[in-house]
Curated annotation (Swiss-Prot):
This is Deoxyuridine 5'-triphosphate nucleotidohydrolase. Pathway: Pyrimidine metabolism; dUMP biosynthesis; dUMP from dCTP (dUTP route): step 2/2. This enzyme is involved in nucleotide metabolism: it produces dUMP, the immediate precursor of thymidine nucleotides and it decreases the intracellular concentration of dUTP so that uracil cannot be incorporated into DNA. GO terms for biological process: dUMP biosynthetic process; dUTP catabolic process. Keywords: Hydrolase, Magnesium, Metal-binding, Nucleotide metabolism. One of its GO terms (molecular function) is magnesium ion binding. Its EC number is 3.6.1.23. Belongs to the dUTPase family. Substrate binds at R70, S71, G72, N83, L87, I88, D89, M97. Its cofactor is Mg(2+). It catalyses: dUTP + H2O = dUMP + diphosphate + H(+). Pfam families: dUTPase (PF00692).
Length: 151
């Protein structure tokens, strides 16, 4: 298991609310919680930037983290990430914030301490560009957006 440096920015984290943990031994994501001042209603169509009370420092340029939605919130309540996926670079050290968007037609209350997203570490391969005049031909070529078939 990889060790991450973390700072607790909200004293409720680790006392009133548990630190991010894996729910099961096979879980890929650490649950992030809404460290709001009070329960907050997210109106239909509204987005809100929610603090997690935590900052991390990955430090390894071969790793990054992504913030992903929790499937139950999206499927059952229409609460998804406002930016779809949050990317945390290895050199970022600020608070982890979660952009939540209510895509439903119903107001949704985000409770203080509620699990709102998950953090997943991913490997990173950095690349540089080799400028060429033409590519070697491939079967697909420049075909995209449904080019490989409709079903």
């Amino acid at each position: 298991m990889h060790a991450l440096q973390a700072k607790i920015l909200d004293p409720r984290l680790g006392s009133e609310f548990p630190l991010p943990t894996y729910a099961t031994p096979g879980s890929a994501g650490l649950d992030l919680r809404a460290l709001l001042k009070e329960d907050t209603v997210l109106e239909p169509g509204q987005t809100l930037l929610i603090p997690t009370g935590l900052s991390i420092y990955i430090g390894d340029p071969g790793l990054a983290a992504v913030i992903l939605p929790r499937s139950g919130l999206g499927h059952k309540h229409g609460i998804v990430l406002g930016n779809l996926v949050g990317l945390i670079d290895s050199d970022y050290q600020g608070e982890l914030m979660v952009s939540c968007w209510n895509r439903s037609n119903t107001p949704f209350t985000i409770a203080v301490g509620e699990r709102i997203a998950q953090l997943v570490l991913v490997p990173v391969v950095q690349a540089h560009f080799d400028i060429v005049e033409a590519f070697d031909e491939s079967q697909r070529g420049a075909g995209g957006f449904g080019h490989s078939g409709s079903h």
